[in-house]
UniProtKB/Swiss-Prot annotation:
<dbReference type="InterPro" id="IPR010312">
    <property type="entry name" value="Transc_reg_CodY_N"/>
</dbReference>
<keyword id="KW-0804">Transcription</keyword>
<dbReference type="Pfam" id="PF06018">
    <property type="entry name" value="CodY"/>
</dbReference>
<feature type="DNA-binding region" description="H-T-H motif">
    <location>
        <begin position="207"/>
        <end position="226"/>
    </location>
</feature>
<dbReference type="InterPro" id="IPR036388">
    <property type="entry name" value="WH-like_DNA-bd_sf"/>
</dbReference>
<dbReference type="InterPro" id="IPR036390">
    <property type="entry name" value="WH_DNA-bd_sf"/>
</dbReference>
<dbReference type="InterPro" id="IPR014154">
    <property type="entry name" value="CodY"/>
</dbReference>
<keyword id="KW-0678">Repressor</keyword>
<protein>
    <recommendedName>
        <fullName>Global transcriptional regulator CodY</fullName>
    </recommendedName>
</protein>
<dbReference type="GO" id="GO:0005525">
    <property type="term" value="F:GTP binding"/>
</dbReference>
<dbReference type="InterPro" id="IPR029016">
    <property type="entry name" value="GAF-like_dom_sf"/>
</dbReference>
<dbReference type="GO" id="GO:0005737">
    <property type="term" value="C:cytoplasm"/>
</dbReference>
<dbReference type="GO" id="GO:0045892">
    <property type="term" value="P:negative regulation of DNA-templated transcription"/>
</dbReference>
<comment type="function">
    <text>DNA-binding global transcriptional regulator which is involved in the adaptive response to starvation and acts by directly or indirectly controlling the expression of numerous genes in response to nutrient availability. During rapid exponential growth, CodY is highly active and represses genes whose products allow adaptation to nutrient depletion.</text>
</comment>
<dbReference type="GO" id="GO:0003677">
    <property type="term" value="F:DNA binding"/>
</dbReference>
<feature type="region of interest" description="GAF domain">
    <location>
        <begin position="1"/>
        <end position="159"/>
    </location>
</feature>
<dbReference type="Pfam" id="PF08222">
    <property type="entry name" value="HTH_CodY"/>
</dbReference>
Length: 262
């Protein structure tokens, strides 16, 4: 059996891998799977809204309702509201308590089941909860030491990623503002007409058709698209006789144009 020191080293190695993008589906899935393996339990990481950031279920509860929670990537609101009120690690919650993650209809199947909840903090804010559960066998002090280590590092990672995303959003907003401000009135009118022709964030347009539709020259559209592409707000590709393929890279463009009437 691995010693506490060996397990600590394993968890440290796992956490050093880090996470680079919170926007991807289940960004902490791989990490949670490896943590669950070291601690020997089922586990999941949720944010303060109850959305799953990662989970691992080596021990199946064989319950359709619980399986659906993980399929939907979200725990029940009632459970989440109770979980976010846990401010310090709560270990070995019995199976018949509200914070136990075991389904009520299956309590008799897991009489010795226990749940442990550990809050995740970063930069002084509550960012989520690390939840672990076992069908049999309480979490020991050694297990809880590993849990505290894991939640501390996850909290630092989450706060750093949130800061990076905030900075990236500010950068994109600034770039979108600057790009729109370089457009003349006619060019802005053209861009808004083009955006309305797209299917969401991408699509193909025919400049001459749009030019005739809003009463401007084709060159105005070409100049407007060139400015936006130079600013990294859109990308375009000629489709020959079919027109031009456009993709909006910076969705802040939509907000900058939304309040303008022509």
């Amino acid at each position: 059996m691995a010693t506490l020191l060996e397990k600590t080293r394993k968890i440290t190695a796992i956490l050093q891998d880090g996470v680079t993008d919170l926007q991807q589906e289940l960004p902490y899935n791989s990490m949670t799977e490896r943590l669950a393996n070291v601690i020997d339990c089922n586990a999941c990481v949720i944010n303060t809204k109850g959305e799953l950031l990662g989970y691992s279920l080596p021990y199946n509860t064989n319950n359709d309702r619980v399986d659906q929670f993980f399929y939907d990537r979200k725990l029940p609101d009632e459970y989440v509201r109770a979980a976010v009120r846990v401010y310090d690690t709560m270990a070995n919650v019995p199976v018949d308590r509200p914070l136990a993650i075991f389904p009520e209809e299956s309590l008799s199947d897991f009489p010795k089941g226990v749940t442990t909840l550990a809050p995740i903090y970063g930069s002084g804010m509550r960012l989520g909860t690390f939840i672990m559960w076992r069908e049999d066998g309480e979490f020991t002090d050694d297990d809880l030491v590993l849990v505290e280590l894991a939640t501390t590092v996850i909290g630092v990672q989450l706060s750093n990623l949130k800061l990076e995303q905030m900075e990236e959003n500010i950068r994109k907003d600034t770039m979108a503002t600057m790009a729109v401000n370089t457009l003349s009135y006619s060019e802005m009118k053209a861009v808004k007409a083009i955006i309305e022709e797209l299917d969401g964030e991408e699509g193909h347009v025919i400049a001459s058709v749009i030019a005739d539709k809003i009463g401007i020259t084709r060159s105005v559209i070409v100049n407007a698209l060139r400015k936006l592409e130079s600013a990294g707000v859109i990308e375009s590709r000629s489709l020959g006789m079919k027109g031009t393929y456009l993709k909006v890279l910076n969705t802040g463009l939509f907000d900058k144009l939304a309040g303008r009437n022509f």
